Curated annotation (Swiss-Prot):
Name the UniProt record assigns to this protein: Phosphopentomutase
Species of origin: Streptococcus equi subsp. zooepidemicus (strain MGCS10565)
Principal location class: cytoplasm
Keywords: Cytoplasm, Isomerase, Manganese, Metal-binding
Alphabetized GO MF terms: magnesium ion binding; manganese ion binding; phosphopentomutase activity
Family: Belongs to the phosphopentomutase family.
Cofactor note: Binds 2 manganese ions.
Binding residue positions for Mn(2+) 2: D298, H303, H351
Enzyme nomenclature, EC number: 5.4.2.7
GO biological process, any: 5-phosphoribose 1-diphosphate biosynthetic process
EC category: isomerase
Role description: Isomerase that catalyzes the conversion of deoxy-ribose 1-phosphate (dRib-1-P) and ribose 1-phosphate (Rib-1-P) to deoxy-ribose 5-phosphate (dRib-5-P) and ribose 5-phosphate (Rib-5-P), respectively.
Reactions catalysed: 2-deoxy-alpha-D-ribose 1-phosphate = 2-deoxy-D-ribose 5-phosphate; alpha-D-ribose 1-phosphate = D-ribose 5-phosphate
Amino acid sequence: MSKFNRIHLVVLDSVGIGAAPDADKFFNAGVADTDSDTLGHISETAGLAVPNMAKIGLGHIPRPVPLKTVPAEADPTGYVTKLEEVSLGKDTMTGHWEIMGLNITEPFDTFWDGFPEEIIQKIEAFSGRKVIREANKPYSGTKVIDDFGPRQMETGELIVYTSADPVLQIAAHEEVIPIEELYRICEYARSITLERPALLGRIIARPYVGEPGNFTRTANRRDYAVSPFQDTVLNKLADAGISTYAVGKINDIFNGSGITNDMGHNKSNSHGIDTLIKTLQLPAFTKGLSFTNLVDFDASFGHRRDPEGYRDCLHEFDRRLPEIIANMKDDDLLLITADHGNDPTYAGTDHTREYIPLLAYSASCTGAGVIPQGHFADISATIAENFGVDTAMIGTSFLADLV
């Protein structure tokens, strides 16, 4: 019998909690990630008031310096720790895959100088559209449309760009290049980037709207991932007849592998929380895992290096956390974590190599406190043990610590 009939895993995309031990091997604009600290620096520079996460125990997570504006509550209601990544990457897919039990020992390919001409020409031949060569390099997703959106509106050319992550992104104004056409082009780009020397983790469709000087990316983003190279705990659950519900871009990240119920993409964090709550209320969802990604922290504020906006986004989630808990059953378990860092006060515009926080709450637990520090895959090991599925993947279960 499962200790918890339902587990709800919520990934606050990019909400790291301090530089990882190997942060010196990862860089932003030539600066090592050694001083990155997403939550810490937001707390220091913008102020951070998250009383509901603090009540679970956020302020108790061991750190060299306590979070400046998040107190260590005297009587926390949950269990907390921080987790370290072992995989060779600091991107969304690597983080999520490791959380589900995989160790990425060979990183995907990244293109610091842009994509080879061969790839660009293939995309042009397939699409019948030219590619703006000046955009073909690592670029902030918002800056690239500011810089080249006006030209695209005039010429219909494609904006193809990358980042420090193993991704190929295609930005297209929805009134210039129809959504379905953009999706077809991205599907083709996916088909030509499945093996070295161009093995990419994701192809991302990045539609936007608006006028020059006031462009806005829309919720019609779509990710085209590769399937995990071996089974994750999602597959183990699905194979055992245990339901898995994906909220937000989770289905894209795993390419549908191991997902029994895709609840759709999020238009915003608030919409994602609404979808999670609707999922919790489903009469058919009596046992299994819900897996939610809330991406606004990362996409709207981390990459844009906007600590105040990031703070406000955290405040919004914290205000709605009681709603999530109110829709849980007594024998449910809520796990709140992240997939990497994206310090909005740091150099560059890309992710930062950090520990991730872990907050665990269940009404059925009578204890609380700090549990041993571990690794991302401890989450998958805990889920596997709870539901009694066989797993030979990495990770150490902390299920016994939740009492």
